[in-house]
Amino acid sequence: MVSAAAPSLLILLLLLLGSVPATDARSVPLKATFLEDVAGSGEAEGSSASSPSLPPPWTPALSPTSMGPQPITLGGPSPPTNFLDGIVDFFRQYVMLIAVVGSLAFLLMFIVCAAVITRQKQKASAYYPSSFPKKKYVDQSDRAGGPRAFSEVPDRAPDSRPEEALDSSRQLQADILAATQNLKSPTRAALGGGDGARMVEGRGAEEEEKGSQEGDQEVQGHGVPVETPEAQEEPCSGVLEGAVVAGEGQGELEGSLLLAQEAQGPVGPPESPCACSSVHPSV
């Protein structure tokens, strides 16, 4: 029996030596065939003793993995094909880090802006103080102490300067009108040429009578007729008054001057139309 099993064992050893450089995928079917051969060797002992024959040669089946080594794929995302895909992959990988850094940067910017705005408000309040202090919001006349509505509190103190400017302008206008009224001459009724002439003639006659009476008195007292300056000044003043009253028209003025010259003729020598400025008593 031992001599009958020896050829089969040699064949198996040769097959095993030939299958050593094969891959792990071929080792599994080789082990299975080896076990089958060993199990079936006992059955074939009787037949091999009578007629020893070699079994047909075994040809292992080729698997697709025996053709050559394949590239091993590494774990992880595939490399990006363009720039945008790279940015998207970067944000996906570091989304938490980006969120934390962004929130901190936003908080820092908010604090800086709030500090700058507060500083500007303080500077503005220093240069332009509030026109309404806090004490003005309390009604001192309210003895009951009732709270006032916010709408009742005035936003700003009433400005009285426009009223003062208006009063001053009105006062100036009133002063100008009063000054112009004072400068105007009093209204007088226009006198006719006949009335003015009559008034001048009456005044001239009265002055002549006074002058003659004074001359008679002086002649009686001293025996020398002396013309006093008063007697000569009075006709001059009367003539001037008559000329002013009748001076509204040029014709009336000329008539009054002629009448005055005629009235002054017998009283004194006609040295000048008016003897008010220079009067020399004649002895």
Curated annotation (Swiss-Prot):
Keyword check for S-adenosyl-L-methionine: no
Glycosylation sites per record: S41
UniProt region (Disordered), positions on chain: 43-76, 136-168, 183-283
Signal sequence residues: 1-25
GO CC terms: endoplasmic reticulum membrane; extracellular region; plasma membrane
Keywords, ordered alphabetically: Biomineralization, Cell membrane, Cytoplasm, Differentiation, Endoplasmic reticulum, Glycoprotein, Membrane, Osteogenesis, Phosphoprotein, Proteoglycan, Secreted, Signal, Spermatogenesis, Transmembrane, Transmembrane helix
Composition bias, Basic and acidic residues: 153-164, 198-213
Any single Pfam family the record assigns to this protein: TMEM119
Subcellular location: Cell membrane; Cytoplasm; Endoplasmic reticulum membrane; Secreted
Transmembrane parts of this sequence: 97-117
Subunit structure: Interacts with SMAD1, SMAD5 and RUNX2.
Protein name: Transmembrane protein 119
Record lineage: Eukaryota, Metazoa, Chordata, Craniata, Vertebrata
